[in-house]
Amino acid sequence: MYPCFLMIGRAERFRISGSFRRAFPLYLEQIHSPSDIKAYMAEQRRALAEEMRAALIERTSHIGGHIGPNLGVIEATIALHTVFDAPTDKMIFDVSHQCYPHKMLTGRAAAYIDAAHYRDVSGFTSSEESVHDIFNIGHTSTSISLATGLAKARDLAGRRENVIAFIGDGSLSGGEALEGLNVAGEMQTNLIIVLNDNDWSIAENHGGMYAMLRRLRE
């Protein structure tokens, strides 16, 4: 078994249907855990994504937050929680500033749709909030190395759950991410890396790795 590396492309520009202040929500109020979306049809997932997008914009307009990174991972987060079985399967979001959709689907939707609860959750993953948040994260490039640790612990315990690291292309060049990739390749075990290749980072990406990613993209 080898580590699996998946790359998702840049999200299209977002369109919001109807008013941001329409009666919330059709689906979000009914979601208390990821199991609630497992049976959704494609159209239901699209409607859920629209609700999540509108809720993010509404909430952020009141209290601030990381709007761009979260708008860009809504569909990817719905897909992750549809395919995998959290919290048995472990998901680690790099930096974790893009965890708002994840929190919406893991029992914390009220913090995004009810103004009275907007400040009930932090802007990053927090193990104090939910068993779905494996680590308290706020730094870049840590997800892959954390995932290798979880995968090693799983293997030593004889378990079979999936371990998923979700990382952006900007974070991928960080030293700890490169060390994590090196260790993951040596482990030859079930470890899934999802690359959010959205072409956004604090500074422009340079180097041989990004030249390779451009070739894959093209």
Listing of model-derived features with the role each one plays in the protein:
Residues 10-15, 21-22:
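Basic polycationic patches enriched in arginine
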Residues 20-104:
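N-terminal amphipathic, basic-rich helices that act as targeting or association modules
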